[in-house]
């Protein structure tokens, strides 16, 4: 079941990218509307999920009407943020002239694990760099891990490790306090990725239950909410098998 928040958040990301590529605010806002409409049109028969709190003004929560009203405001706030901070946080460029706007990364880590993604923004801050991820939700991320992964990915692919990271909260129109990403290293991430790969290969998926689960579009496939889809295994029998194997070695 698709969520309006995914379509709306993607539309905000797209519109801010259009703005940073040189468009004016009016064009960027129109880019939001066009992208949002296209996303909804791709699934004309779908029942879309609305997240957010229901209020007297928005009795259905953050539905399509909410996003059409609030999405453009997020784009305008971003444009004002860039106007206010461009002297402090100019867009960084790679040596090849590639701008830090949806900067592609696809480095390979130890063990053949390839990480592919796009970094929303990379800003220059005097002699340092700042990686920034745009968030259109109402809650700030609890961890800087995503930013740390981006920093290491940039080091492997572009030869520079950004010292700082921050989330830009589109609803507020401001960045979260910058955090030092120096302690994120390739060795640390490679170890985590290897362990995650082992878990996937063993068909082990541990639910991460948070307040965001209420708006998740795929929770019907998660056994934390739908017991009938739980993996077919017996924890006790697996332990017994492991114990017997060790006894016979």
Question: Predicted segments — roles?
Answer:
Residues 1-4, 22-24, 203-207:
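Short, polar/flexible loop-turn hinges at active-site or ligand-entry regions and domain interfaces
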Residues 2-16:
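Gly/serine-rich nucleotide phosphate-binding loop at the start of the catalytic core
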Residues 4, 8, 67, 71, ...:
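Hydrophobic (often cysteine-bearing) scaffold residues that line and stabilize catalytic clefts
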Residues 11-14, 145-153:
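Short amphipathic alpha-helical face segments that pack within enzyme cores
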Residues 15-104:
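A non-catalytic, helix-rich entry segment at domain boundaries
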Residues 18-22, 152-157:
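Active-site catalytic microenvironments for nucleophilic, acid-base chemistry
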Residues 96-103, 111, 141-144, 154-249:
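Metal-dependent nuclease catalytic regions and adjoining charged, substrate-binding loops involved
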């Amino acid at each position: 079941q698709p969520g309006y928040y995914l379509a709306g958040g993607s539309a905000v990301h797209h519109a801010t990218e259009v703005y940073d590529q040189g468009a004016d605010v009016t064009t960027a806002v129109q880019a939001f509307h066009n992208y949002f409409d296209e996303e909804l049109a791709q699934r004309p028969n779908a029942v879309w999920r609305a997240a957010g709190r229901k209020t007297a003004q928005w009795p259905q929560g953050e539905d399509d009407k909410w996003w059409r009203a609030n999405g453009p405001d997020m784009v305008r706030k971003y444009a004002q943020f860039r106007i206010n901070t461009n002297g402090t946080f100019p867009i960084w460029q790679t040596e090849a002239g590639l701008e830090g706007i949806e900067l592609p990364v696809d480095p390979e880590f130890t063990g053949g694990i390839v990480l592919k993604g796009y970094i929303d923004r990379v800003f220059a801050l005097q002699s340092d760099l700042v990686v920034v991820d745009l968030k259109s939700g109402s809650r700030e991320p609890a961890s800087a891990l995503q930013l740390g992964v981006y920093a290491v990915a940039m080091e492997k692919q572009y030869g520079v490790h950004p010292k700082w990271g921050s989330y830009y909260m589109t609803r507020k129109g401001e960045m979260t306090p910058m955090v030092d990403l120096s302690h994120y290293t390739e060795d640390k991430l490679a170890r985590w990725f290897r362990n995650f790969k082992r878990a996937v290969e063993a068909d082990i998926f541990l639910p991460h239950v948070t307040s965001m689960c209420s708006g998740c579009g795929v929770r019907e496939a998660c056994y934390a909410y739908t017991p009938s889809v739980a993996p077919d295994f017996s924890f006790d029998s697996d332990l017994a098998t492991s114990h017997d194997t060790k006894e016979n070695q």
